[in-house]
Design a protein with these regions (language model features):
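A glycine-centered loop/beta-turn motif at secondary-structure junctions
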Residues: 189-194
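A short beta-strand/loop micro-motif in the catalytic core of glycosyltransferases
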Residues: 79-80, 177-182
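Core catalytic region of metal-dependent phosphoesterases/phosphodiesterases
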Residues: 9, 17-114
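Extreme N-terminal starter segment of soluble prokaryotic enzymes
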Residues: 1-4
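Conserved catalytic scaffold of divalent metal-dependent phosphoesterases
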Residues: 67, 87-169, 173, 177
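Catalytic metal-binding/acid-base residues of hydrolase active sites
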Residues: 10, 54-55, 86-87, 130, ...
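Conserved small/polar residues in nucleotide/adenosyl-binding loops
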Residues: 195-202
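Residues at the N-termini of beta-strands
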Residues: 47, 177, 185-186
Length: 202
């Protein structure tokens, strides 16, 4: 299986707001994301995993449509995403009810849920933020289950105010790969299992 794991892209961010170069830097973030889509197409990846904060804020409908068009351009890649603390799913969020391309699955629930992709023999688990801060570990107790060969988990947080979790306990949950977001620093928390990602500077 081949997949790309990203998080904290923060589309819609305007770095250095008020300065002449701010708009250009904001567009550079979008272009970084487009490069990831092109990479997924070129490498024919099975999955694109997005572990929260694809957007810097509540996404505009036109922004969701632009992102969805990019996802639709890689129909052989299954895109699975969750919302993080910046783009959390508010009651009036455009995330709710959005008509994603056929190859896209958003795990909208604030509680852990699972999507099975039989043709890839893979199950992907995760949950989205429904508010800016989540003080409890909603992933505590989530375990891989079912008959799929591969089990992947999307997780966003890891500090005291954003779904605090214990890496050691997560390692015992039976997942083949845990794709983390929020840390803003790529790294390996547990070798061969628990990884953080930051796509903003790709």
């Amino acid at each position: 299986m081949r997949f790309i794991h990203i998080a904290d892209v923060h589309l819609g961010m305007q770095p250095d707001a008020g300065f002449p170069w701010s708009e250009e830097r904001g567009e550079a973030i979008w272009e970084s994301f487009r490069r990831i889509i092109r990479l997924a197409s070129r490498e024919k990846t099975d999955f694109l995993l997005i572990a929260g904060d694809l957007f810097q804020r509540q996404p505009l409908l036109r922004e969701l449509k632009e992102v969805n068009d990019l996802f639709a351009s890689i129909p052989e890649t299954i895109v699975v995403l969750i919302a993080g603390n910046h783009d959390y799913v508010k009651r009036e969020s455009f995330y709710r009810g959005f008509d994603w391309a056929d190859n896209v699955v958003m795990l909208l629930s604030p509680e852990p849920e699972c999507v099975e992709v039989p043709e890839k023999r893979t199950a992907v688990y995760g949950c989205s933020y429904d508010k800016k801060e989540i003080l409890e570990n909603r992933l505590d107790g989530v375990r891989q289950e079912g008959k799929m060969k591969y089990h992947l988990l999307l997780a966003h947080g890891g500090d005291a105010r954003h779904m605090p979790w214990n890496p050691g306990r997560m390692a015992q949950a039976g997942f083949d790969y845990i794709a983390c977001g929020h840390i803003h620093k790529p790294g390996i928390l547990i070798p061969c299992l628990l990884y953080t990602s930051d796509a903003a500077d790709e």
